[in-house]
Amino acid sequence: MRLGVCFSLAAAASVARAALTATENDTSIVLENDRLRATFDKGRGSIIDLYLDGQDFLGPQSGSTGIGPYLDCYCTPSGFYTAGSTNPVTELVQGTDSTGTKYAGIILNDTYTPTGQEFQQYWFLRDGETGFHMFSRLAYYNETTPFLRNLQELRTLFRPNTDLWTHLTSSDLQTAPLPSDEAIAEQIVVQDATWRLNNTPDDAYYQQFSEYFTKYTFSNHWRDNDVHGLYADGSTSDGTTYGAWLVMNTKDTYYGGPLHSDLTVDGIIYNYIVSNHHGEGTPNITNGFDRTFGPQFYLFNGGGSSSLEELRDEARSLASPSWNADFYDSIAKHVIGYVPSSQRGSVKGTIKLPKNAKSPIAVLTVDGHYFQDNSAVPSSHQYWADIDKNGRFSIDRVVAGKYRLTVYADGIFGDFTRDGIVVKARKSTSIKETWKPESAGTEIWRLGTPDKSSGEFRHGAARDPTHPRHPPEYLIYWGAYDWQSDFPGGIDYMIGESDPATDFNTVHWAVFGPTPDNPVAESNTTHDWRIRFDLSAKQLHARKTATLTIQLAGAKAASGNTDVYNASEPYANLPLRSYINEQEEPLTMVIGYDQSSSCIVRSAVSCYQVREKWEFPASWLKEGSNLLRLSLPTNGTNYESAVLPTSVYVQYDALRLELK
């Protein structure tokens, strides 16, 4: 086997050692070492041929397939734009980095004439590696039109057109055979970008993974996602296996923090640099906007008989901000806006955590803003690190500046935040804090686990028992399940007796359906949910104030994932009303149009977080049986231009009742 499978972070991305060459003519640039050869089309602004050990990784060009990696966006007034489509100007740069390693880079410059938006895309190949270091830049300088629009999507794509690739993977749980050409030809569209494959029941994807295929099935949180890509098992390449991967070796120029989730791979390998698929905020493109994103690394490996897991592990071994940091410093002179090591510091901290805090994480984002809203400051950077059992964490290579520290953990309501964390270049900032969990008295009950996810409830993270790869149920497609069969009488949950995994749904619909198997939408049993609980005289004795906390892992108002207010929609801002016993006036949470997310309909159980706490008189409660009724608008729907469910909905993270 030509490749080792256990690589240290200091290891190169392959064992290639021959000198790198770069040749240019009027129409193309070719970058090549002894294993990897790439041809760049100067007129198109994209790589059009890519070979590893003589194996074609892209296949023939056909429209927008058989090319990549390349850059496009949804960011012009008319929508989509592919960098290089107007007047591509390319530059070839070459040099030797601080380690004595040769490199060559292609820089694409393109200006979208109607607005003056400037695009730059960078591809760098180092000698001894079989992949491309990628940076992307968007700039907008226009005093006449100081506000253009939001940067709704910015992404790079590796888009093959070949039967070489047999599997796609974004995690151990999200690994599957690619649907066959026959399955794709015979598929039935059931939702935007979602197919039913029951016309080809012998297809490997159908047999092993799911009856439904959607690009959203392979989306992931950025906290959990380091590498994703395609695998060739050798069945179409004479027994030789290959991999193509997007390695997220840095994440500091994305937005949304560790809870940002996005598409990864669906036959195309994406690097979704900016998007709002699951409701995350996106930056506005205003006069002076100038942002360089990256680096990330597209790795191409294989050439022997390595398994998918082995090739993926090789890619994952490179997913560290320290990998190739010296190289990035060497090429900073070529990359406008890249922040070199000389302008970065580090943070080390100790947090005394609440009892029973699980999977704690420390997050650094822009000062003064909720961490999921850091796109409000487009120039901001973001970092995070797991906190160990002793409460310690460390984060290196932090761009100098002022940050907010956020700490959260599974099992704990609320977050710890501290503004004003100053990071200085080439200095280490120390933090020592105590996180005192929020409390409004004695906890009477909680429903769900506060972990910023609705996955613990029915059809959430539970594994699908009907397919041998057993994907989590929420990843498959919401319409694969039937509300009327699961909850014929609606939700009637008894604290202390009911099981959250079966008796509480992962999503609270105002209206459920229609689905592929049931053309009738259900609203009578969906919009009102009942939670019953008993209280004793002892629990109520001398209590004056009760506090109800509701944390949502996601919610969809009429704005969906767009953050656009539409006055014609009655649920542009969505009310969730909580009624206590016989009280006629509810405790009302209003989910704003800019807090809405397309969560479960895009196969997610953790999106933009929304929470509310209410104090109310303890006299509203009584000894014996009590009722909390959670109510969404009856028949609450909105207009959808795409093939998506029209219902508004919420997804509960956790609820809690306290008394004092």
Swiss-Prot record:
Q: Which reaction does it catalyse?
A: Endotype eliminative cleavage of L-alpha-rhamnopyranosyl-(1->4)-alpha-D-galactopyranosyluronic acid bonds of rhamnogalacturonan I domains in ramified hairy regions of pectin leaving L-rhamnopyranose at the reducing end and 4-deoxy-4,5-unsaturated D-galactopyranosyluronic acid at the non-reducing end
The record's section on InterPro entries has: Carb-bd-like_fold, Gal_mutarotase_sf_dom, Galactose-bd-like_sf, GH-type_carb-bd, Polysacch_Lyase_4, RG-lyase_II, RG-lyase_III
Glycosylated sites: 25, 109, 142, 284, 524, 566, 635
Q: GO: which molecular function terms?
A: carbohydrate binding; carbon-oxygen lyase activity, acting on polysaccharides; rhamnogalacturonan endolyase activity
User: Which cysteine pairs make disulfide bonds?
Assistant: none
* Signal peptide bounds: 1-18
Which regions are flagged for Basic and acidic residues bias? 453-466
Question: What family classification does the UniProt entry report for this protein?
Answer: Belongs to the polysaccharide lyase 4 family.
What's this chain's function?
Pectinolytic enzymes consist of four classes of enzymes: pectin lyase, polygalacturonase, pectin methylesterase and rhamnogalacturonase. Degrades the rhamnogalacturonan I (RG-I) backbone of pectin. Active against linseed rhamnogalacturonan.
The protein depicted here goes by the name Rhamnogalacturonate lyase B
* Gene behind the chain: rglB
